[in-house]
């Protein structure tokens, strides 16, 4: 009886922590950091899935989200995955309409994502060298390349 109870509890806990975004990302997303985010009735995960399919509206909404603390590192890594899939050229067109404040926030979010991403193509790189066009669009001139 204990064995069945344990299996039931493990299954329940696993189902609570699973999400449908991480399956499409190259890393496991700590979904609890994002579970309260809803934009126009869409969850963070729905926006991520839409963005990974190239949906411009989802990409723009995700690029505008401001998340604090550790969540910003993971959110930045998500944005890097999106840029990698949709290409930097398409991403630049989509985010070109951001306000100056949103552009500054996006810069720091992607900077944090470069610190967090497990993708060897981007991990530990600087935004100035890996995405110079994005840095130019975002207008962040006074930040050193590191």
Model regions and ranges:
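Sec-dependent N-terminal signal peptides
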Residues: 4-13
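Bacterial signal peptide processing site
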Residues: 17-18
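N-terminal low-complexity, Pro/Thr/Ser-rich intrinsically disordered segments
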Residues: 21-39
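Boundary/linker elements of alpha-helical solenoid repeat scaffolds
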Residues: 28, 38-47, 73-76
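Second-shell loop/turn segments in exported
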Residues: 33-35, 46, 63-68
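Amphipathic alpha-helical scaffolding segments comprising HEAT/armadillo-like alpha-solenoid repeats
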Residues: 53-63, 88-95
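Extracytoplasmic electrostatic interaction patches
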Residues: 70-146
């Amino acid at each position: 009886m204990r064995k069945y109870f344990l299996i039931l509890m493990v299954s329940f806990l696993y189902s609570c922590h699973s999400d449908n975004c991480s399956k499409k990302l190259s890393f496991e997303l700590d979904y609890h950091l994002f579970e309260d985010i809803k934009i126009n009735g869409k969850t963070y995960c729905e926006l991520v899935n839409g963005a990974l399919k190239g949906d411009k509206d989802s990409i723009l909404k995700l690029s505008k989200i401001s998340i604090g603390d550790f969540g910003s590192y993971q959110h930045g890594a998500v944005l890097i995955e999106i840029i990698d899939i949709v290409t930097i050229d398409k991403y630049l067109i989509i985010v070109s309409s951001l306000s100056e404040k949103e552009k500054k926030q996006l810069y720091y979010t992607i900077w944090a994502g470069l610190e967090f991403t497990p993708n060897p193509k981007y991990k530990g790189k600087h935004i100035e060298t890996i995405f110079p066009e994005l840095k130019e669009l975002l207008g962040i001139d006074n930040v050193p390349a590191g």
